[in-house]
């Protein structure tokens, strides 16, 4: 990639239909883990006009009112009126869960003891990434995209813009010079709205109240292209506008396209599923590498075979920004991080009901107390082992 270029990422709000599905799936996972932390959960959700379907595989001793959890989640998001196309009180909720296949369970059922050789729940490859573009060590385009839809939700909830509705999407294009963010080129924000708001008033309010307060002043250079509801009317949205499915926003959930993705979604999956836990571990590793000052960008790939504890591969790429070689960093990763599935669960304390909060506005780059994978507690040890000075972002 050239050093001067434009890069774009997008995000969606908690009221986007796919995110409604993700949040229901993770709310169900949390409710199960609260009662039985060794449960096996793969909770999938479909939501359409007036309909929610819960399906997947769940093996647990927990006694859960799945229908009520789905309704409560829809209510929290803000779909509390039949005019919105789905209403938590009146929507139909269908439940069709099976138990986990015994053929899969045999490789992961040693989770109750202290043996760290629990096998991976599936084969696959996962990536983690960090860079020094923001204090959170995230790529700037996805970081700003998340903050825009977060602010849309905040102004909707507190009534400052009462005509806002739950569904929204954002997109940010950043100009890079010498490989670093230089300026904001384009901001797109589409928001669902009440039918009586005029488009010019909507556009002015969105630009002045949502977009401008979110953008860093040092990146505003020249005229930014603001595209607000570029098709015009956006009254029909949420699950009425599009069918929502768990796991369809995997790039929004991670790095906005700035890093590869192994293809496995996160929401609704207990941490024995390496699609989720190993991706969290990858972020933890990459963030500590950058926080340690070993590199300004770090990409981690880890892969697994079903029923096998040790990763089949671990790869580190610092894109030429490393202060020591990638081979040295890879060796340090293997020494300082236990990337076996049970080791990850223990290292990041993942058998907790912490997942609903991850299901909107990104799983990474948020300083939430439950997000153990955002800690930089390994950075000092990595820096000392590599013989470099850590950055100021060690926490």
UniProtKB/Swiss-Prot annotation:
- Catalysis: reaction(s): L-methionine + ATP + H2O = S-adenosyl-L-methionine + phosphate + diphosphate
One family from Pfam that matches here is: S-AdoMet_synt_M
Is the keyword Calcium assigned to this protein? no
Q: In which pathway does it act?
A: Amino-acid biosynthesis; S-adenosyl-L-methionine biosynthesis; S-adenosyl-L-methionine from L-methionine: step 1/1
Provide the binding site for Mg(2+): 18
- Region annotated Flexible loop sits at 100-110
The entry assigns this protein to a family as follows: Belongs to the AdoMet synthase family.
> What name appears for this protein in its UniProt entry?
S-adenosylmethionine synthase
Species of origin reads: Burkholderia vietnamiensis (strain G4 / LMG 22486)
